[in-house]
Design a protein with these regions (language model features):
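Non-catalytic DNA-recognition/assembly elements of restriction-modification systems
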Residues: 9-40, 49-53, 150-158, 163-168
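Catalytic cores of nucleotide-enabled group-transfer and carboxylate-activating enzymes in metabolic
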Residues: 18-29, 85, 103-110, 133, ...
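Short amphipathic alpha-helical signal-transduction/dimerization elements
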Residues: 116-120, 124, 164
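DNA target-recognition patches
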Residues: 5, 30-61, 69, 73-75
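Interdomain signal-transducing alpha-helices
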Residues: 112, 119-120, 153-156
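Extended, domain-scale alpha-helical bundle/helix-rich regions
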Residues: 1-11
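A short beta-sheet element
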Residues: 54-56, 65-117, 127-129, 140
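Short helix-capping and inter-helix turn/linker motifs at the boundaries of alpha-helical repeat units
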Residues: 6, 88, 131-135
Length: 168
């Protein structure tokens, strides 16, 4: 299989790390997933920082921040664990080291999250910055992702979940 991408006015052949079935599309992660700031708000709410989300500290409240809703996905973009994704357990303000992870509604969310998890170590080990390492957004945005039909996305995500349960 050969894959091509338009870069400016030129069509360029892209070398990919995997072979994909003919009925799959191949896109860049930035085409189906974006890192956004979230909605700025005022008023007391819980601070959803990494320690709290990992269960290593109790809840604190803050007066303002970037609001996220229960069920949203947020990704660490600063610090040693850049690239780690959390599902927000309750409404609140995301910690300052996070971005809201917007996922295209045409995709099966667990499939995209499994894809990002697959690259977690690579994202963690390719951070930018010396004092405070940051997520390598160029790497994140440009990861090629195979897009199977929707039912296949569901089947793959369910199988990954089943197998990961065996590893626990």
């Amino acid at each position: 299989n050969k894959y091509y991408e338009r870069i400016n006015a030129q069509i360029v052949e892209i070398e990919l790390p995997f072979e994909y079935p003919n009925n799959w599309s191949v896109l860049r992660l930035k085409d189906i997933c974006q890192l956004i700031d979230g909605e700025k708000r005022n008023g007391k709410s819980i601070c959803l920082d990494a320690k709290y989300l990992r269960g290593k500290s109790s809840a604190t409240t803050v007066e303002k921040g970037k609001f996220v809703y229960a069920g949203d996905n947020i990704i660490l973009v600063d610090g040693e664990n850049s690239g780690e994704v959390f599902t927000v357990p309750q409404n609140g303000y995301m910690g300052s080291t996070f971005k809201l992870l917007w996922l295209s509604s045409v995709m099966w969310k667990p499939y995209i999250l499994a894809f990002i998890l697959f690259y977690k170590e690579e994202l963690k080990n390719s951070k930018r910055g010396a004092a405070i390492p940051h997520l390598n957004k160029e790497l994140f945005n440009n990861l090629p992702i195979g897009i199977p039909p929707h039912q296949e996305q569901q089947r793959i995500a369910e199988r990954i979940n089943e197998l990961s349960q065996l590893l626990k």
